[in-house]
């Protein structure tokens, strides 16, 4: 964690009056048009979770449950047993910490076909420690039967929602809301559960990233390329079940690796990659860019990412360090 200069803008919500794109809400709406079994539950957060589209069009399939996440998850489990496909919405931290026992006992254990949709992952909220989900991936990874997905950005949300729907069982979908419209030349990304996506190829180093850290990993790879270091960048959108076979193959080829995540380095992507390598007896240290063993503080996302070492330059610095210790695996 580094010292940073504080500015008023770092503690001010700049998008209060801004029209924010609603890629998730539109994707859920389109899905609901085709499948009448889909129902939506919300913990008094319809606009922030983009479920107001669904509420206004399908009021008889929308259930506002109040700020009672544990009860909401229990209700969703019962609805799933009756044949509905519940999409359950709140902020990541509330779905995971507050309702964890219900998620474990009423969703994961019976393999209920419930889709848990969490917003405000990691350091993407200025509301401080009570709203920052820095351990949600760790909590959900630990649950048997739970699928954990984090799309890289708005260009992958539609595919992520459809993949979650098609998955037979519980899914935790970790979403960061888009702040701007996608440009017309943005390539829409497909999401195949359990399969990584290689976005850049190189022989010197491999960076595994998820969520908003993918773009920072790609920017870091470009900077490294200018110094003659060619990097493979991998979008690990499915953290569980993870694509261990491809991960091991890529690391064995490059011999040096970094993970980058908007999450604690404990229990998240870094641990998942380490586990995959360890089980194949690949003896390479996984160098991690993420939140160290600490809580965060309030502030804007750029301020927090800089303070806690999750910026592009942090990935570059970590890459230069790990390359000095590179081991080629045969």
Each predicted region: which residue ranges?
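Thiamine diphosphate
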Residues: 1-174, 179, 190, ...
């Amino acid at each position: 964690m580094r010292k940073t200069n504080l500015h008023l803008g770092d503690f001010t919500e700049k998008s209060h009056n801004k029209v924010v794109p609603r890629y998730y809400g539109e994707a859920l709406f389109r899905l609901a048009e085709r499948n009448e079994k889909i129902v939506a539950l919300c913990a008094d957060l319809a606009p922030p979770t983009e479920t107001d589209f669904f509420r206004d069009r399908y009021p008889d399939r929308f259930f506002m449950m109040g700020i009672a996440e544990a009860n909401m998850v229990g209700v969703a489990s019962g609805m799933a047993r009756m044949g509905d496909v519940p999409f359950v919405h709140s902020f990541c931290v509330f779905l995971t910490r507050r309702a964890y026992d219900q998620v474990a006992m009423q969703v994961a254990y019976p393999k209920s076909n419930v889709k848990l949709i969490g917003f405000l992952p990691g350091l993407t909220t200025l509301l401080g420690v009570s709203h920052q989900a820095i351990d949600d991936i760790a909590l959900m990874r630990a649950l048997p039967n739970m699928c954990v997905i984090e799309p890289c950005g708005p260009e992958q949300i539609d595919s992520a929602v459809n993949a979650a729907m098609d998955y037979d069982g519980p899914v935790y979908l970790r979403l960061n809301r888009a702040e701007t419209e996608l440009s017309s030349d943005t390539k829409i990304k497909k999401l195949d559960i359990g399969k990584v996506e290689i976005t850049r190829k190189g022989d010197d180093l491999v960076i595994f990233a998820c969520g908003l850290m993918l773009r920072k990993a790609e920017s870091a790879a470009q900077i490294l390329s200018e110094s003659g270091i060619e990097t493979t960048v991998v979008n690990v959108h499915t953290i569980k079940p993870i694509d261990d076979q491809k991960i091991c193959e890529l690391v064995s080829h490059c011999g040096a690796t970094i993970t980058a995540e908007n999450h604690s380095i404990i229990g998240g992507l870094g641990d998942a990659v380490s586990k995959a390598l360890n089980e194949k007896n690949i003896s390479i240290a996984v160098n991690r860019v993420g939140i160290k063993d600490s809580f965060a503080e309030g502030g804007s996302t750029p301020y927090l990412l800089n303070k806690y070492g999750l910026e592009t330059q942090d990935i570059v610095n970590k890459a230069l360090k790990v390359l000095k210790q590179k081991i080629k695996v045969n």
